């Protein structure tokens, strides 16, 4: 790994390789050894030198600073189950676990060096030595973006992680991302591009992981994404239907427009084609007059997205009731007498015409048959 400190000297690398080979030999022969994975620590973090191949009948664990077990180099001694004794090299940050591992809290760079453990059993004494390297983490990465004020579906943002590390990860809204059809990460991992930003893109952050399980994150970049309006809803009191609001003269009428938009949109009201000086999303007509009847339009405008929507409503008075139709027939008395006389006279006239017609028909015939009223 590439740490922000001088690299290991060649002899230390050789020592580390020798330690790994020795550990392999010890593991094969059943000897104790210090786990190679625990021989790398990080400044200001806890370091645990893990002891492997520990026998079961341990009487005492003794840890020393250096390659020998001299008394002045002893850090800590632990006799299971509860007897613990600090030594001359104890700094107040060390302890020994029940498994015999050495724990160093708040590791410092000067903790780097050889460590030796001595394990006493009823039959023998085993010893293991390892080189501990405490590294100093590089500073947290920086982050920059070409812009933080964007329009949804139109703009893209390019963010760069300012670091020399090669192990970089990106977080959008605190969630790790590895790229998608909307997001692109450069091959070196240092650049993230979000194409066609969304209203749900709020924060950007990058992180490096030079040491396993230690994540160093950059500061957050807050994105401001303008969006909307998607639509406009219109609420009225009294309620309207099919774009028509029916209200009586002198009654109170309320109109209110609502929409989802960022930033807050501008509102305009138009009455019968004329702009009203009402910049709010609602208006009230406390006492409706004839002059206030007609069409109203609520216009919603987002200056950032340059989107404009509107809704219309027409205020009109109730329709007058239809005239009542009297279905009863009334005829005055004189008219009744007149109609009776007219009917009688008309009937007599019709009978006279019929008799006359019959008489004429009989008298014109070439062969006269006897008429019903003629006798022998």
From Swiss-Prot:
The chain crosses the membrane at residues 331-351. Glycans are attached at residues 69, 95, 110. Mostly expressed in the small and large intestine and at lower levels also in other organs. It is found in: Membrane. Residues 229-314 form the Ig-like C2-type domain. Belongs to the immunoglobulin superfamily. CEA family. This is Cell adhesion molecule CEACAM18.
């Amino acid at each position: 790994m590439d740490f922000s400190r001088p690299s290991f000297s060649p002899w230390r690398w050789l020592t580390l390789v020798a330690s790994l080979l020795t550990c392999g030999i010890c593991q094969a022969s059943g000897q104790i050894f210090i786990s190679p994975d625990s021989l790398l620590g990080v400044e200001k973090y806890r370091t645990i030198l893990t002891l492997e191949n520990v026998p079961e009948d341990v009487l005492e664990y003794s840890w020393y600073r250096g390659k020998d077990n001299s008394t002045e180099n002893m850090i800590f001694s632990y006799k299971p189950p509860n007897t613990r004794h600090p030594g001359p090299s104890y700094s107040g940050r060390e302890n020994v676990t029940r498994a015999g591992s050495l724990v160093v809290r708040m590791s410092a760079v000067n903790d780097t060096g050889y460590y030796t453990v001595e394990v006493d059993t009823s039959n023998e004494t085993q010893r293991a030595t390892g080189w501990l390297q405490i590294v100093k983490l590089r500073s947290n990465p920086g982050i920059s973006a070409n812009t933080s004020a964007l329009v949804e579906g139109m703009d893209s943002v390019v963010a760069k992680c300012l670091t020399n590390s090669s192990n970089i990860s990106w977080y959008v809204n605190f969630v790790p991302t590895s790229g998608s059809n909307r997001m692109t990460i450069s091959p070196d991992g240092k650049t993230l591009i979000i194409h066609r930003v969304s209203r749900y893109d709020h924060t950007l952050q990058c992180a490096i992981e030079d040491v396993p399980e230690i994540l160093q994150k950059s500061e957050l970049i807050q994105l401001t994404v303008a969006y909307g309006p998607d639509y406009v809803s219109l609420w009225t009191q009294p309620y309207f239907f099919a774009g028509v609001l029916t209200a009586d003269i002198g009654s109170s009428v309320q109109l209110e427009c609502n929409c989802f938009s960022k930033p807050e949109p501008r509102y305009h009201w138009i009455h019968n084609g004329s702009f009203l000086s009402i910049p709010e999303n609602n208006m009230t007509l406390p006492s409706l007059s004839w002059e206030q009847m007609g069409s109203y339009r609520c216009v919603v405008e987002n200056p950032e997205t340059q989107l404009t929507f509107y809704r219309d409503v027409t205020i009109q008075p109730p329709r007058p009731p239809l005239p009542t139709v009297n279905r009863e027939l009334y005829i005055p008395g004189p008219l009744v007498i007149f109609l009776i006389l007219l009917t009688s006279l008309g009937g007599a006239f019709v009978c006279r015409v019929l008799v006359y017609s019959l008489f004429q028909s009989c008298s014109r015939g070439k062969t006269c048959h006897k008429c019903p009223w003629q006798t022998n």
